[in-house]
Regions:
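Short, glycine-/small-residue-rich phosphate/pyrophosphate-handling segment
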Residues: 93-112
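Short gly/ser-rich anion-binding loops that grip negatively charged ligand groups
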Residues: 61, 65, 87, 100
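Short glycine/serine/threonine-rich phosphate/pyrophosphate-binding segments
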Residues: 70-75, 96
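A short helix->loop->beta-strand "cap" motif at the edges of active sites that frequently abuts
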Residues: 82-85
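Residue-level detector of secondary-structure boundary/capping sites
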Residues: 17, 88, 102-105
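Short beta->alpha junction loops/turns
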Residues: 43-44, 68-69, 103
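Glycine-rich beta-strand-to-loop/alpha-helix junction loops that act as flexible
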Residues: 9, 66-68, 89-91
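ATP/NTP phosphate-donor binding region
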Residues: 1-63, 73, 77, 108-111
Length: 112
């Protein structure tokens, strides 16, 4: 399965991380599980447009959204309109959406 990951570098946890290293690590973990992941790291101001591009990409089977509740909410709406599966990567302050779904709040565990 091919995922496109849109990672909001302005989201809580991501603000303090080396995003290039994280994206490379996440792509490697997906490959180890027989999937592919293409990470796109974006600023919050560019998030909606990139989510829309990713959901419209014919090579994508699912969208991985990384960020806080605002990022995940925007991604959910776009995925719904495109009838696309959404994977959640909690990287905000509260991560209420991820908590309600039982997604692990530690990034490494959520990626795995």
């Amino acid at each position: 399965m091919h995922f496109i990951g849109v990672l909001n570098k302005d989201g809580g946890t991501f603000r303090t991380m080396d995003m290039a290293a994280f994206a490379t690590s996440a792509e490697r973990v997906f490959a180890e599980h027989g999937n592919s992941l293409e990470c796109r790291v974006v600023a919050g101001a560019d998030l909606a447009a990139e989510l829309e591009r990713a959901a419209s990409d014919p090579s994508s089977d699912a969208l991985l959204a990384g960020g806080g509740d605002g990022t995940i909410s925007a991604a959910a709406g776009i995925c719904f309109s495109h009838r696309m599966a959404l994977a959640v990567l909690p990287a905000g302050t509260m991560n209420l959406f991820a908590r309600s779904l039982g997604v692990p709040l530690q990034l490494d565990a959520a990626v795995a």
